[in-house]
Amino acid sequence: MPAIQSPSGKILQLEMENFKSYKGHQLVGPFKDFTAIIGPNGSGKSNLMDAISFVLGVRTGQLRGSQLKDLIYAFDDRDKEQRGRKAFVRLVYQMDDGVELRFTRSITSAGGSEYRIDNRVVNLDEYNGKLRSLGILVKARNFLVFQGDVESIASKNPKELTGLLEEISGSEELKKEYEGLEEKKASAEEKAALIYQKKKTIGNEKKLKKAQKEEAEKHLRLQEELKALKRERFLWQLYNIENDIEKANEDVDSEKSNRKDVMRELEKFEREAGKRKVEQAKYLKEIAQREKKIAEKSSKLGKIQPELLRFKEEIARIKAKIETNRKDVDKRKKEKGKHSKEIEQMQKSIKELNKKMELFNKKRQDSSGKLPMLDSQLQDYFRLKEEAGMKTIKLRDEHEVLERQRRTDLEALRNLEENYQQLINRKNDLDEQIKRFKDRQGEIETSSSKYKNETTSLKTELRALQEKHVNAREASAKLKTRIAELEDQLSDLTAERYENERDSRLTQAVESLKRLFQGVHGRMTDLCRPNRKKYNLAVTVAMGRFMDAVVVEDENTGKDCIKYLKEQRLPPMTFIPLQSVRVKQVFERLRNLGGTAKLVFDVIQFDPELEKAVLYAVGNTLVCDELEEAKVLSWSGERFKVVTVDGILLTKAGTMTGGTSGGMEAKSNKWDDKKIEGLKKNKEDFEQQLENIGSIREMQMKESEISGKISGLEKKIQYAEIEKKSIKDKLPQLEQEERNIIEEIDRIKPELSKARTEVDKRKTEMNKLEKRMNEIVDRIYKDFSQSVGVPNIRVYEETQLKTAEKEAEERLELSNQLAKLKYQLEYEQNRDVGSRIRKIESSISSLETDLEGIQKTMSERKETAVKITNEINNWKKEMEECKQKSEEYEKEILDWKKQASQATTSITKLNRQIHSKETQIEQLISQKQEITEKCELEHITLPVLSDAMEEDDSDGPQFDFSELGRAYLQERRPSAREKVEAEFRQKIESKTSEIERTAPNLRALDQYEAIQEKEKQVSQEFEAARKEEKQVADAFNTVKQKRYELFMEAFNHIASNIDKIYKQLTKSNTHPLGGTAYLNLENEDDPFLHGIKYTTMPPTKRFRDMEQLSGGEKTVAALALLFSIHSYRPSPFFILDEVDAALDNLNVAKVAKFIRSKSCQAARDNQDAEDGNGFQSIVISLKDSFYDKAEALVGVYRDTERSCSSTMSFDLRNYQES
């Protein structure tokens, strides 16, 4: 196949203004033969590709935007809302001869597109035409591969590949025409076949009509004879019916006169009863008013009772609280008295110690403690003492130091012992408080738990009672509503309805028949009913004597029933056998007459198996709402038998029977008998359910009582929780204080022990120094001691020293006792025992104030309750008096009603007699109507004495019976009439049987001539259809061949190139031959209607489906197909968006090498199909192993200062490897 030459030229540069993420005017380029667009994600690379696609005419929907305004740069939503925003993209295209073309597409302020070529405004068709002349096919997108297109092509099924190839080849443009002609061809073929079949059918029909023509004449002759026989029979029947109607009317007039007298008496009785009812109503009204007031006050009393219970609980709780507080005050007062006594005792002890201290000081001052001594001896003593002092000065200094240290240690020891004792006392107090709080906490827990259990139990009981109350109230309301509804329905249904003895006997008789004979269905009144109550009277009149007819399965069952009635001497009944009864078909046109007219048959509800019986009873009788409409239907144009909803009957013969009698109304009320019994039973059931529900008032009282108890318990729990929380808050503080004191005691104990050790140590050291000092002094005072007669000088001084030491110890003891008592007195005085007593007494005062308020409110509520109770009792008393008066009037009303009932019974009896006669008359009239209807239906004209449209007092026109023979005009018994009827029936059946045996087509003559003409027309139609079929088939084959050629041209080109391209993409040093790829058609006759199988085999791998290839292998296969398709419809440039995304580095290098080989100037100059066509490549890529093969780079980056995308270009040709 000759190579398809690629158009020359390339994209030189791109200008943009406010397009997508590119703000203001920006210039991109120049673009080289192989240009790579790079940049980080989100920088705007794809927007640059969208700009090239936009200027080349690609639709907005493919550019990630729903409308053109979405493509205009906008920093935020405020920018988007600004009016007058514009944008444009201009592409500078350079031809091989250096001529530049400028394609510009702008977005106007109105949101539309404007196209320019070299700054000249053109329309879209001219714009696309110019692009097409350069090899740029916008619709086929042969110059563009969007991001994701490679994956999309790799995942296409065979049918989708066919669609892609159709789009590329252009055969898709013929698809609509192809399918339209294909449909026309099938339609033309079907039409020709139908006309041929029609022609064949008409030929067969022509033979049949010829035979039917001869049979028709004989049949018409027999029909005329049958019509004359029926006319004579109908005249004889009408003659007998009119005589019977005249006798029955005389009897009815007599009975009606008697009924009128009795009705006057009934009116009198009812009038008297009405007067008594008016008087009784006054008392009943008074009773209702009293009941309403009692209910209102009872409701108010019901609200007060729970309040009284709640007040009672509150009073008990407050009293208990006051009692507890008083006991606590008494206890604390005792403690206060004890505390005061302790303070007095301490103050007394302090005074005594102070006195002892004063006496001790005075005694010490008075006592000198010295022994008598001579003056010379005294001088020697002082001299020696001075000498001893000089020799022991150093030791005395050390002794004084130790003495001072010992006094300091003793002072510290006394302080530690005092602190220790204070801490021990405070710890004991805290232990006592903590124990008291914990005991109280236990008591509160026990009582609170008890109250909670009682509350839970009462709440459970209350919920159950409330649920029962709500359910009872809802059930009571529903039952009362249902009972009221049933009473209304019963009132409507039973108004003016009285039991009929004859109907009762008939009902019992029918029940017996149903029990004895299997084929008895029941009476018409039991088996069907009007679908709406307003049609009751109309259906009753339309059915006439058949309303009480009994429906049986067959004639034998009917005969057995008649025999049983005769044996039991029961009233006669009419029977309708379903199997043998003959009915007229419903005329469908009568259902579409308009207005309120309907078929009586359509307003009756019945079981489908009883359809024949109902149709036999009512026929094609119509029902409508108004008399005027009935007259129009019955007497204008085609005549119909019509009955109004008021019971007025209009016949085809022109007669009109109107007015309603008691008998007719009672008869129409039979439709409601079953419903009334059901309603009565339902009412009794509902009343029993209402009685079983119980008293709602008692439930309310009990509910209020339990609510009051719960409220009291919840208050107790609330107060317990408050006290519990107070203890819970204080207890940790006391325990923490105790822990702190214990820690302090533990800290002081070692210090106390250490202090005592230090004191003892100082004492030992001092004793050692004193011993050394004594030895020195003894040597010095040796001679002096002998002279004064003492072993040593200390004997002289000991008396004074011991006395001093003893005095010092006594003084220390007194000081310690005094300090201890002062500290204890200060501690006890700081304990404010009275504040707690004052606080509790204040609480008691507040509680007593609350108690007085609640007791006062409770007293007011009690007074209100007593007042309401007295009012209720007074009203009950008045209500009882009204009830007595009402009962007296009720007795009088019952007496008058009893007399009215007797009159009503008489009227009912007379009504039954009148009804019996009227029923007889109605049956006779119905029979007469049926006869006239049969005559009209069978087109039999009866002789009349006057015009058929004239009316008189009789039931229909006056027939002329003069044509009857004298034998037929004689009065006969029923048995004789039956015999004559049997003779007529035998003659008619014989004639009918003869007619039925012929069964000709009476329209055969006319049909025979018509079918001859029809045969001629069909032959002409068949020839025209064949001609049309040939024309459509020729047009279809032409389009099919053109579509086939376009498709196969593209397929053959792509199939022949794909293997070469795939080998170039997959070959390597290891596998120099590369892989294998080929395309196969699933159907070679109609390839565009079926799929294309694309198969690839990568190097070293066996054949496998495309779905089983790896992601990279699929991408390489898809690229091979894309490049093959491009070679068929080559564009001067090829723009690819991240086609290397799924490729590994090795495949990236291969694809880059391939694109470079096709993009270099040499490849573009050498347009050879063997190696594929050269083209300019613009590729978006994120992989450096790909874009480092390009001749130029266009870098896209995000300009953060301007909040837009910007570009920069870099020429790589100077850095390419040779």
Curated annotation (Swiss-Prot):
Keywords: ATP-binding, Cell cycle, Cell division, Chromosome, Coiled coil, DNA damage, DNA repair, Meiosis, Mitosis, Nucleotide-binding, Nucleus, Repeat. A motif (Nuclear localization signal 1) lies at residues 183-190. Disruption phenotype: Altered chromosome dynamics and cell division during seed development, leading to aberrant mitoses and giant polyploid nuclei in endosperm as well as arrested embryos with a few small cells. Its main location: nucleus. Residues 518-632 form the SMC hinge domain. Residues 11-1200 form the Zinc-hook domain. It is found in: Nucleus; Chromosome. ATP binds at G39, P40, N41, G42, S43, G44, K45, S46. GO terms for cellular component: cohesin complex; nucleus. Residues 159-505, 671-938, 1003-1035 form a coiled coil. GO terms for molecular function: ATP binding; ATP hydrolysis activity. Mostly expressed in flower buds and stems, and, to a lower extent, in leaves and roots. A motif (Nuclear localization signal 2) lies at residues 425-432. GO terms for biological process: cell division; chromosome segregation; DNA repair; meiotic cell cycle; sister chromatid cohesion. Belongs to the SMC family. SMC1 subfamily. The flexible SMC hinge domain, which separates the large intramolecular coiled coil regions, allows the heterotypic interaction with the corresponding domain of SMC1A or SMC1B, forming a V-shaped heterodimer. The two heads of the heterodimer are then connected by different ends of the cleavable RAD21 protein, forming a ring structure. Cohesin complexes are composed of the SMC1 and SMC3 heterodimer attached via their SMC hinge domain, SCC3, and an alpha-kleisin subunit SCC1 linked to one SYN subunit (SYN1, SYN2, SYN3 or SYN4). Central component of cohesin, a complex required for chromosome cohesion during the cell cycle. The cohesin complex may form a large proteinaceous ring within which sister chromatids can be trapped. At anaphase, the complex is cleaved and dissociates from chromatin, allowing sister chromatids to segregate. Cohesion is coupled to DNA replication and is involved in DNA repair. The cohesin complex also plays an important role in spindle pole assembly during mitosis and in chromosomes movement. Essential protein plant viability. Required for chromosome segregation (e.g. This is Structural maintenance of chromosomes protein 1. It comes from Arabidopsis thaliana (Mouse-ear cress).
